[in-house]
């Protein structure tokens, strides 16, 4: 009996069915593999759990997930996403899954060769067109000690438009930034507490670059570094798509790790798979460190420096000689007029230079320091009128970039091996510091006169009886020592808290919680040497004190030298304890550091202390490395 050959339509149907049956297990295997792939885990911000198997997403917004278990179930979230992006559009197409999550949609379709449904994402396409982005630039704003959120610096991304005739106005470009969504009435102390321990949602936002410059450069006096990223057009597209996915969605903000810099690293990891920048983060993400990691991954093509308004004004004043600076200060403060005899005695070029520098200073003070308009506006007008009748000096190129960028300074993690003598006993010691910089660290790449230490542990092992002790446990220690002059009069200040060894009248030394602070002034003597005068206050709390606590007002007079090869801090500090054990404590101290490049330093210190009618001589020698 002859075999019957199926008709063509039936044969096609059978073949399609057999292919579907054979493809289903393959797609199942593909989905299981994709659920733990690096790119999927990055897209949904999954990270391995530290103390158990599995993953947890750092996204804290339920709307970021399609699966109810999506926060901890990568495979379940992938399957739910595939179902969502494959469903037909109903209602507003802009609410469709592929429009809400275009980066996920594009990646999944590429991996599984899924057909594209007929869904038009008008809002997303209009948003991209409005941003008009050809390239991405990572921008680093230098540290700003007067704000807890910016003490370590700040990073954000600039979305650069296509160049038109080589003259693109980057001030009009947009930026991507991540920050804590804090209430306006929250104090800096509350902000610091909630930023450290949690409590603020973090929000990714898009805003114009000129607004960022106004805040960071013009008002907060922070220099900006611009790092052009060498992303391809496809990588730029992927970054924008993922920004659309996460903007206005909550990722809880933490000051030391899940901060502005951390979120931007995640965006770069999404744009260029395999960079694994987030793998560098352990306990904290310092913005300058994150920039260093980006540079080390060869992600940067060019670097540009944008000085702050204060840096530019200071540079203009520095071009004047001492007599011209005196005249500029007198003009700005209204002691002399623009047509006074001292000004008219100058030749045209010097007069123009003085008027230019004074005008820039007055305008800066009016904006950054809120000089009254009724004073600043008339004076600015008088300076402009006087200047308009003069031929200008050769155009100044403005301040030169620092020799060392912030990302080129020493690493922020420090480890030191020490040895010394505390007046009666010898010891060896170990110091560990999580971050960031102190006055005697190699200064290149850091703000002169600025100190910010976070989580520093000093330990000792005494050689006579092998007794181990914690000498200091510093939670946070900040010092801002900016020199004063005729134009700028910043307040020098310091604050810190933690635990430290305190000597009792019996001679015993106990670990005591403390809070300390101070305020005063700093004056530059030479380019590298400054004099400090600080009024201080200390609070110690301990059950070993007669009243459980003690308070000490005091003063600290010192000299500070910061140099690339050698740094020195020496002075006299005195404080009077007035509550529990009423007595005075005086200390003459000398601390120095020899810098062996930016990775190592040798430190030595010595002091002579008078405390409880006893004199003690202390010294310490150590080797410090930065990681």
Residue ranges of each PLM-predicted region?
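Outer-membrane beta-barrel "beta-signal"
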Residues: 432, 615-627
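Transmembrane beta-strands of outer-membrane beta-barrel pores
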Residues: 419-425, 436-438, 458-465, 477-479, ...
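Active-site nucleophile-His-acid catalytic modules used for acyl/amide transfer and hydrolysis
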Residues: 209-284, 540-542, 625
């Amino acid at each position: 009996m002859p075999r019957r050959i199926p008709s063509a339509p039936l044969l096609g149907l059978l073949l399609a069915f057999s292919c579907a049956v054979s493809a289903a297990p393959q797609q199942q295997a593909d989905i299981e593999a994709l659920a733990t792939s690096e790119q999927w885990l990055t897209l949904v911000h999954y990270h391995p759990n530290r103390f158990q198997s599995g993953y947890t997403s750092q996204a804290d917004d339920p709307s970021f997930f399609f699966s109810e278990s999506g926060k901890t179930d990568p495979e379940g979230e992938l399957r739910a996403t595939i179902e969502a992006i494959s469903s037909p559009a109903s209602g507003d197409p802009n609410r469709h899954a592929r429009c809400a999550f275009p980066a996920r949609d594009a990646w999944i379709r590429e991996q599984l060769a899924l057909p594209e449904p007929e869904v038009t994402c008008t809002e997303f396409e209009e948003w991209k067109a409005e941003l008009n982005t050809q390239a991405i630039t990572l921008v680093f704003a230098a540290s700003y000690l007067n704000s807890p959120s910016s003490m370590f610096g700040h990073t954000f991304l600039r979305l650069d438009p296509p160049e038109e005739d080589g003259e693109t106005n980057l001030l009009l470009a947009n930026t991507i930034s991540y920050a804590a969504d804090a209430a306006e009435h929250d104090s800096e102390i509350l902000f610091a507490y909630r930023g450290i321990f949690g409590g603020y949602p973090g929000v990714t936002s898009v805003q114009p670059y000129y607004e960022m410059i106004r805040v960071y450069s013009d008002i907060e006096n922070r220099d900006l570094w611009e790092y052009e990223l060498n992303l391809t057009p496809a990588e730029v597209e992927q970054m924008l798509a993922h920004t659309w996915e996460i903007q206005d969605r909550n990722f809880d903000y933490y000051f030391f790790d899940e901060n502005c810099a951390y979120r931007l690293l995640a965006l770069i990891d999404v744009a260029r798979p395999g960079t694994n920048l987030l793998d560098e983060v352990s306990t904290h993400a310092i913005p300058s460190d994150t920039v260093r990691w980006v540079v080390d991954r060869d992600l940067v093509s060019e670097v540009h420096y944008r000085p702050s308004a204060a840096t530019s004004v200071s540079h203009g004043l520095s071009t004047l000689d001492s007599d011209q600076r005196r005249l500029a200060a007198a003009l700005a403060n209204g002691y002399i007029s623009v047509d006074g005899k001292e000004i008219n005695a100058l030749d045209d070029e010097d007069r123009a230079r003085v008027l230019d520098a004074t005008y820039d200073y007055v305008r800066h003070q009016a904006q950054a320091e809120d000089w009254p308009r009724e004073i600043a506006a008339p004076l600015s007008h008088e300076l402009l009128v006087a200047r308009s009748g003069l031929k200008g000096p050769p155009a100044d190129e403005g301040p030169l970039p620092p020799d060392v960028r912030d990302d080129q300074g020493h690493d922020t993690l420090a480890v030191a091996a020490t040895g010394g003598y505390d007046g009666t006993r010898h010891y060896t010691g170990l110091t560990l510091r999580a971050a960031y910089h102190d006055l005697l660290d190699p200064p290149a790449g850091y703000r002169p006169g600025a100190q910010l230490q976070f989580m520093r542990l000093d330990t000792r092992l005494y050689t006579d009886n092998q007794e181990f002790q914690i000498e200091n446990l510093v939670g946070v220690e900040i010092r801002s020592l900016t020199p004063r002059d005729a134009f700028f009069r910043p307040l020098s200040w310091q604050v810190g808290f933690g635990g430290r060894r305190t000597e009792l009248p019996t001679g015993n030394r106990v670990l005591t919680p403390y809070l300390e602070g101070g305020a005063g002034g700093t004056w530059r003597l030479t380019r590298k040497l400054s004099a400090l005068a600080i009024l201080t206050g200390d609070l110690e709390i301990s059950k070993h004190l007669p009243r459980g606590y003690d308070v000490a007002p005091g003063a600290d007079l010192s000299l500070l030298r910061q140099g690339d090869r050698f740094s020195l801090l020496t002075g006299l500090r005195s404080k009077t304890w007035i509550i529990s054990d009423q007595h005075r404590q005086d200390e003459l101290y000398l601390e120095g550091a020899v810098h062996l490049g930016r990775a190592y330093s040798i430190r030595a210190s010595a002091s002579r202390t008078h405390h409880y009618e006893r004199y003690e001589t202390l010294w310490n020698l150590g080797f410090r490395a930065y990681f």
